[in-house]
């Protein structure tokens, strides 16, 4: 991330990470200083902001366009690279980018990769040894509703055709793509309520458990665990004391009753890890299900905890 601390840098170098993705000149200076004190040579990739506009579901998930906090501006990267090459405790081995999240087409990657390879050639022309690693980040889209997920094989072919002639090793970070659809938030209906001509289904999970709908206006499919023959249109809301506490608004859902279980789908990414104790609420348990077997991997939090 853009805010690495001294301690985090020490831990990374002591652990022997493949490389540290440097986001700014100041961070490069810190890394050089820490590596010198440890008697190490820090492996570094420069995270480049390639200034690629991406059509993402929410502007918060655009990370590779000019004016964002992420990465070194494209037109400043060569100068930063030249500084890195002159540092005794820095080994510049690669370049890195991450242009956004929920990307469903190839063009942003093609543009970004083209700019990184241009930089690679300029940096090597400035005296660098052959750069080895090209980290293209993540951001591959998954299907939350009826969207078509990105074609991974076709994506791989696009990347291969661009990168293969350079001889660089490609690193991909497909976090959400791997786990997004693997998680389900299970919640129980507490009450049904009608107010102002609207129907509300009040459940025992709230924005502190899954903040994506409130924070990003993100869509998650919501279904009764036991399907109902009847349907209703309702807001599915939680117990937190603000109007932004919802899991879905104006949804056509199963006509569930108090005590029924409801499944909020595609909650495997940016779900539990973004949960909090807001409103003095305890965090949920996590249960791993595999081939008909299950086990608790994170115990339900208690007030004593």
Regions found by a protein language model. Name each.
Residues 105-112, 143-155, 181-191, 249-252:
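Short glycine/threonine-rich loop-to-helix capping motif typified by GTGT followed
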Residues 158, 167-305:
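Charged (often Lys/Glu-rich) extended helix/loop segments that serve as interaction or gating elements
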Residues 1-133, 142, 158:
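Active-site-proximal beta-alpha core segment in soluble small-molecule metabolic enzymes
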Residues 22, 97, 136, 172-174, ...:
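Conserved beta-strand positions
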Residues 118, 125, 130-132, 150-165, ...:
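Acidic/histidine-enriched ion/cofactor-binding microenvironments in catalytic or ligand-binding pockets
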């Amino acid at each position: 991330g853009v805010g690495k601390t001294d301690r985090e840098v020490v831990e990374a170098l002591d652990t022997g990470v493949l490389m540290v993705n440097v986001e700014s000149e100041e961070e490069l200076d810190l890394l050089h200083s820490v590596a010198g004190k440890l008697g190490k040579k820090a492996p570094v990739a420069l995270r480049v902001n390639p200034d690629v506009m991406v059509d993402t579901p929410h502007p918060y998930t655009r990370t590779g366009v000019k004016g964002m906090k992420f990465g070194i501006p494209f037109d400043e990267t060569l100068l930063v690279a030249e500084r890195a090459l002159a540092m005794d405790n820095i080994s510049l081995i690669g370049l890195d980018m991450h242009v956004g999240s929920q990307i469903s087409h190839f063009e942003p990657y093609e543009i970004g990769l083209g700019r990184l390879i241009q930089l690679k050639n300029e940096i090597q022309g400035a005296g660098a040894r052959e750069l080895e690693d090209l980290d293209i980040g993540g951001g591959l889209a998954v299907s939350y509703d009826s969207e078509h997920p990105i074609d991974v094989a076709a994506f791989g072919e696009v990347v291969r055709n661009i990168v293969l002639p350079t001889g660089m090793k490609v690193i991909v970070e497909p976090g959400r793509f791997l786990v997004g659809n693997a998680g389900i938030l299970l919640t129980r209906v507490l009450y049904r309520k009608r107010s102002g001509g609207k129907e509300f289904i009040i459940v025992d999970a709230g924005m502190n458990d899954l903040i994506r709908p409130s924070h990003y206006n993100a869509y998650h499919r919501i279904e009764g665990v036991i399907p109902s023959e009847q349907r209703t249109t309702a807001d599915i809301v939680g117990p937190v004391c603000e109007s932004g506490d919802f899991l879905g608004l104006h949804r056509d859902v199963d006509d569930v009753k108090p005590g029924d279980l409801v499944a909020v789908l595609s909650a495997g990414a940016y779900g539990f890890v973004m949960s909090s104790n807001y409103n003095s609420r305890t965090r949920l348990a996590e249960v791993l299900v595999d081939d008909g077997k299950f086990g608790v991997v994170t115990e339900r939090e208690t007030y004593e905890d």
